[in-house]
From Swiss-Prot:
Organism: Arabidopsis thaliana (Mouse-ear cress)
Keywords attached to this entry: Membrane, Transmembrane, Transmembrane helix, Transport
Compartments in which it is found: Membrane
Phylogenetic lineage: Eukaryota, Viridiplantae, Streptophyta, Embryophyta, Tracheophyta
Keyword flag Membrane: yes
One BP term from GO: purine nucleobase transport
Protein name: Probable purine permease 8
Location of the region described as Disordered in the Swiss-Prot/TrEMBL record: 373-394
Pfam families recorded: PUNUT (PF16913)
GO molecular function: purine nucleobase transmembrane transporter activity; purine nucleoside transmembrane transporter activity
Length: 394
């Protein structure tokens, strides 16, 4: 009995000693771990801030530079389309350097697609749609003032919600309906009120063509976004960072090839030399303008993909929506676009529609996070819940 008591006392002392040591170790680990996440959090928000700047700045810059090209003697719509796409190799570099800081992929990340034909078909279909959208937006930017062009193009949010209703079972909540209505009215005001615009530089027919092409580009962008969401969910069946980046890069590759064919088939390539020589700002500014457009579009794309990776697709879409009203304001300053009452009212309606659209997606994301929060004390639910996140690093 005494031996048993001695053993118990010794074990008790050992346990206390172990507990004391464990507490000290836990305290040390807590101090170290509290500083590590804080440091990582700063770095994450720094990256998010950089990506937000990329989206807002390059979205406006690429549109403004596109108009600068046309204002100073540029006439090739195919060239204006090509520079939107030809910088796609930058995306492969972005993907490579982003992957170097990610953990090693698991076996699930190396899943083979059932058919390379399916994957190729996805890139070709989306690439054709991208080329059509880019060409229509180039024609619209050629014939319309920048402020009018950007406001009409903002209706892409309404088209995105419309196509998502059919392709992705998007629910029409009061905020979405309000956004659809406001953005439609905003664009309609500019379409029906063409008499107030200064159309001295283009004929009435070309102005109408510009409006039709811009609306077509807006609808095409909405269809593309909804279709990509469907493809990632139903066809590719994984929404990883590398999958999204590859999809954007390869569809840009296909679109660039299509536009190059159009450039040579139309014969516009023959006029590029004389266009450069007669460019009002000179030959070097001509090349620099086109190069800057190509770079700014790809930096914008990097910002969009980066925001999806660091935050969510909802946040990325929201930042894109916030940036759209910036272009008309910049256009008034740079190109002295006429800002009449109807255009001001259109901007107000567009901003109201953006806020309604963004707020609904904020509610959706908040609801999604709430539903994915696991109960305290039940760690077995964590792996299953983590599997529901939209974008995973690869």
């Amino acid at each position: 009995m005494e031996i048993t008591q001695v053993i118990y006392v010794n074990d008790h002392n050992n346990i206390e000693a172990n507990l004391t040591g464990q507490e000290e170790m836990n305290t040390t680990m807590e101090i170290e771990s509290s500083s590590v996440p804080q440091s990582k959090n700063y770095k994450k928000w720094l990256r998010i801030s950089i990506y937000v700047f990329f989206v807002l700045a390059c979205q406006a810059l690429s549109t403004i530079l596109g108009r600068v090209y046309y204002e100073n003697g540029g006439k090739s719509t195919w060239m204006g389309t090509l520079v939107q796409l030809i910088g796609f190799p930058v995306l492969f570099l972005f993907r490579f350097f982003s992957q170097t800081k990610n953990p090693k992929p698991t076996e699930a990340d190396f899943r083979k697609f059932s058919s390379f034909t399916i994957l190729g078909s996805v890139y070709i279909v989306t690439g054709l749609l991208v080329s059509a959208n880019s060409y229509m937006s180039s024609v619209g930017l050629l014939y319309l003032p920048v402020s009018t062009f950007s406001l009409i193009l903002a209706s892409q949010l309404a088209f995105t919600a419309f196509f998502s209703y059919f392709l992705n079972s998007q629910k029409f909540t009061p905020f979405i309906v309000n956004s659809l209505f406001l953005l439609t009215i905003s664009s309609a005001l500019l379409v029906v009120n063409t008499d107030s615009e200064n159309t001295a530089k283009v004929s009435r027919v070309k102005y109408v063509i510009g409006i039709i092409c811009t609306i077509g580009a807006s609808a095409g962008i909405g269809l593309l976004l909804s279709l990509v969401q469907l493809i990632l969910r139903k066809v590719l069946k994984k929404q990883t960072f590398s999958t999204v980046t590859d999809l954007v890069a390869y569809q840009s590759l296909v679109a660039s090839c299509v536009v190059l064919i159009g450039l040579f088939a139309s014969g516009e390539w023959k006029t590029l030399t004389s266009e450069m020589e007669n460019y009002k700002l000179g030959k070097v500014p001509y090349v620099m303008t086109l190069a800057s457009i190509a770079i700014s579009w790809q930096v914008y794309t990097i910002g969009v993909v980066g925001l999806i990776f660091e935050s969510s697709s909802v946040f990325s879409n929201s930042i894109t929506a916030v940036g759209l009203p910036i272009v008309p304001v910049v256009a008034v300053i740079v190109f002295h676009d006429k800002m009449n009452a109807s255009k001001i009212f259109s901007i107000i309606l567009a901003i109201w529609g953006f806020i309604s659209f963004v707020y609904q997606h904020y509610l959706d994301e908040k609801k999604l996070k709430t539903s994915h929060t696991s109960p305290v004390g039940d760690p077995h639910l964590l792996p299953a819940e983590e599997g529901h996140t939209n974008i995973h690093s690869v």
